[in-house]
UniProtKB/Swiss-Prot annotation:
Name under which the protein is recorded: Digeranylgeranylglycerophospholipid reductase
UniProt keyword Nucleotidyltransferase, yes or no: no
Signal peptide: none
One Pfam family of this chain: FAD_binding_3
Gene Ontology molecular function terms on file: FAD binding; geranylgeranyl reductase activity; oxidoreductase activity, acting on the CH-CH group of donors, iron-sulfur protein as acceptor; oxidoreductase activity, acting on the CH-CH group of donors, NAD or NADP as acceptor
Pathway named in the protein's UniProt entry: Membrane lipid metabolism; glycerophospholipid metabolism
Miscellaneous information on this protein: Reduction reaction proceeds via syn addition of hydrogen for double bonds.
Keyword vocabulary terms for this entry: FAD, Flavoprotein, Lipid biosynthesis, Lipid metabolism, Oxidoreductase, Phospholipid biosynthesis, Phospholipid metabolism
Superkingdom classification of source: Archaea
Length: 391
């Protein structure tokens, strides 16, 4: 089989890359190792309304609910409320990822991409030292898919990057180990996402609740890998639910890992590009990665079209991708990495003090940067080293 570009992984980033490249006239193959795209769901499913709408038209079929904003809780229960449009990239719509991911893959197919499920990439094909496609297993048969460029959108455990010689290694402190329940509870607030901080609740991470309507919610937590033990996230999550939602009924459970390392040093090689979690483009504070992956996927699709058209699919031909995604989303990722590294060092007493300090402030219309500016003003001794983030 021969094509211009093969995309490995049909998550949001991979599907957007495939769709964009196909719209530019390339012959595209999108492969997915699972037989059902979007399943299992491994995230809280929240996205910003404005940012999502800037990339695709929202469709009620894949929107589970809309929220008014977010509540952020300190360990002692004190909290602040932020409006939806100021709460970051994970608050606004709560998606049905199983439907959403398939819809994005269908959009890629409508644009002209060939979508191949139950197709697992096994290795890269090489010719004269250059990457020229992938070898894959499909329905028990080994197949070769020749291509000028391989886009690796194969998630946190990306093999494409490793095969291409890109260092994608993660240290324990670079990953949040997560567990999540889809549960029913009459006490779920269907209008607000909720975030709970505290080292007793989730060491180096936080607990989240994303309402999906009719008192269903994704309730989960992440624990920084360097402070986790086998099975700890599930145990901690069960304890949280038992204490806060004793009448809850668990419908589904998923576990996984999210990179919070900040971007890897390079996301391209000769004939190879990495997108989304494979490139460590998720937000280091929240772990959210849907929108960053989609934006990076669109950039990758545009750049690969130019590279194939020019006949230069080596590092120089793909360098525009590296530059464009770092300029558009990389700066915020870098700022949030600094914040993450600082806040995971704080004690619960520190977190309580910070929350108490802004109780009298109207933060409902502040974004994260604005809130941080106020916190630094009110707590200069504790937060002075973060002042460069709000300059």
């Amino acid at each position: 089989m021969r094509c211009d570009v093969v995309v490995v992984g049909a998550g949001p980033g991979g599907s957007m890359a495939a769709k964009t490249a196909a719209e530019k006239g390339l012959k595209v193959v999108l492969v997915e190792k699972r037989q059902e795209i979007g399943d299992p769901v491994r995230c809280a499913e929240g996205v910003s309304k404005a940012r999502l709408s800037s990339m695709i038209k929202p469709d009620p079929k894949w929107i589970a609910s809309e929220v008014k904003g977010a509540r952020l809780y300190a360990p002692d229960g004190s909290n602040v409320v932020m409006s939806e449009d100021k709460s970051g990239d994970e608050v606004g719509y709560v998606l049905e990822r199983k439907i959403f991911d398939r819809a994005l893959a269908m959009d890629a197919a409508r644009a002209g991409a060939r979508v191949m499920v139950k197709t697992r990439a096994l290795d890269l094909l090489r010719a004269n030292g250059s990457v020229k496609g992938i070898r894959a297993m499909r329905y028990g048969e080994i197949i070769d898919i020749e291509a000028d460029v391989v886009i690796g959108a194969d998630g946190v455990e990306s093999k494409v990057g490793r095969w291409a010689g890109i260092d994608t290694a993660l240290k324990p402190g670079d990953i949040e180990v997560c567990a999540q329940f889809l549960l029913y509870d009459k006490g779920i607030d269907d209008e607000y996402c909720e975030f709970f901080l505290g080292n007793e609740l989730a060491p180096g991470g936080y607990v989240w609740s994303f309402p999906k309507g009719e008192h269903l919610a994704n309730v989960g937590l992440g624990v920084i890998g360097s402070r986790s033990e086998p099975g700890a996230p599930v145990k901690l999550l069960r304890r949280f639910v038992e204490r806060r939602m004793p009448e809850a009924r668990i419908v589904e459970m998923v576990v996984g890992g999210v990179p919070v390392s900040g971007p890897i040093e390079r996301t391209i090689a000769d004939g190879v590009m990495l997108v989304g979690d494979a490139a460590r483009q998720s937000d280091p504070i929240t772990g959210g990665g849907i929108l960053n992956a989609m934006q990076a996927g669109m950039i990758a699709g545009e750049v690969v079209a130019d590279a194939v058209s020019s006949g230069d699919t080596g590092v120089e031909g793909l360098m525009a991708y590296e530059k464009r995604w770092r300029e558009s989303i990389g700066k915020q990722i870098a700022r949030h990495l600094d914040l993450k590294e600082f806040f995971i060092r704080l004690s619960d007493d520190d977190l309580n003090k910070l929350m108490h300090s802004i109780q009298s402030e109207d933060v409902s219309k502040m974004d994260l940067r604005g809130m941080l500016r106020v916190l630094i003003r009110l707590n200069p001794k504790m937060l002075w080293e973060l002042r460069h983030l709000v300059m």
